[in-house]
From Swiss-Prot:
Lineage: Eukaryota, Metazoa, Chordata, Craniata, Vertebrata
Designated name of the protein: Diacylglycerol O-acyltransferase 2-like protein 6
One GO CC term on file: endoplasmic reticulum membrane
Organism: Mus musculus
EC number(s) stated in the UniProt entry for this protein: 2.3.1.-
Chain ranges passing through the membrane: 22-42, 102-122
Function: Diglyceride acyltransferase that uses fatty acyl-CoA as substrate. Particularly active with oleate as a substrate. Has no wax synthase activity to produce wax esters.
Length: 337
């Protein structure tokens, strides 16, 4: 009986670790957006708000530069429960020499990019042990860093804005040993996420190649097998009012928040039930061989296209070499749009 109780407790802690993830950002954002004005206007604690605003002004560019990473936050026990919920695994196929900087491309986006977050923004899968002397910076939407408290929380995890200024700084201010992680499919790719489907947007994504050429950073493919299995996604039939409503909600979400609001469902609080928790499906992120890139301050179109094709070939090779090992058939194809 004690063994069953222990197992139930562990399962409960894993579930709670997932449940807290998005609400924490909402809570921190609400505290900063509503709490500070309230203290300023309606309480005798207004000096705290003034000091906080002065600090924000002073600290405004930190997230664009080196951030404020905390090894303590990245090693929270919370993330071990988060990682073991699926579970998530990090697999290295080649060493990353600390003599270079890197752009690691994470595919696919999935619904919430669990694999990228756990492997690169926490130490629950041992990134620092697997890739010693490499400092990872997971890139996400720049707008999130406009929200006080949220930006500090993200910086403590080593997360940075996916902006040209921020990424260029991290790839040039330190000669070697930095790795920025980009999810090139972005919000649009989340709409492609479905169990059993391996489809990504890449053929028109040239920004990361230009960045690599301008900074001389090596390109590194990575693929999270199982990422698309974490949620079921519904796309309603064309011509129905449900599809009309779905399209408009997605347009509004993309315009205002920079994200696509997907119609998803997963499991409930108990296994086998229906709800909005992700399915407990293993996610294995395989990091491939670095692709050397020359430093060219002003690369022409042909050079950019050449290295994009080289990268696509490297990604296909990585996918095909490991797909059968991580749950896909040997004939399963990666579709690149």
């Amino acid at each position: 009986m004690a063994a069953f109780s222990c197992l139930d407790l562990q399962e409960g802690l894993r579930t709670l670790s997932i449940l807290q993830w998005i609400p924490v950002y909402v809570l921190l954002g609400t505290l900063s957006i509503l709490g500070m004005p309230y203290l300023l206007l309606f309480t005798t604690l207004w000096p705290l708000s003034v000091l906080f605003l002065v600090w924000i002004a002073y600290d405004w560019n930190t997230h664009i530069q080196d951030g404020r990473r905390s090894a303590w936050v990245r090693n929270w026990t919370l993330w071990k429960y988060f990682q073991s919920y699926f579970p998530v695994k990090l697999v290295k196929t080649h060493d990353l020499s600390p003599k270079h900087n890197y752009i690691i491309l994470s595919h696919p986006h999935g619904i919430l990019s669990y694999g990228a977050f756990i492997n690169f923004a926490t130490e629950s899968t041992g990134f620092s042990r697997v890739f010693p002397s490499i400092t990872p910076f997971l890139a996400t939407l720049e707008g999130i860093f406009w929200i006080p408290f949220v930006r500090d929380y993200l910086m403590s995890l080593g997360i940075c804005p996916v902006s040209k200024l921020s990424l260029t700084h991290k790839l040039t201010q330190k000669d070697s040993g930095n790795a920025v992680i980009i999810v090139p499919g972005g919000a649009s790719e989340s709409l492609l996420s479905r169990p059993g489907v391996s489809m990504i947007y890449l053929k028109k994504r040239q920004g990361f190649v230009k960045l690599a050429l301008k900074t001389g950073a090596y390109l590194v493919p990575s693929y999270s097998f199982g990422e698309n299995e974490t949620y079921n996604q519904e796309t309603f039939a064309e011509g129905t009012w449900l599809r009309f409503f779905q399209k408009n909600i997605q347009k509004i979400g993309k315009r205002i928040l920079g994200i696509n609001l997907c119609t998803i469902h997963g499991r409930g609080l108990t296994r086998g039930s229906w709800g909005f928790l992700p399915f407990n499906h293993p996610i294995t992120t395989v990091v491939g061989e670095p692709l050397p890139v020359p430093k060219i301050p002003d690369p022409d179109k042909e050079t950019v296209e050449k290295y994009l094709e080289l990268y696509i070939s490297a990604l296909r090779k990585l996918f095909d070499q490991h797909k059968a090992e991580y749950g896909l058939s040997k004939t399963h194809e990666l579709k690149i749009l």
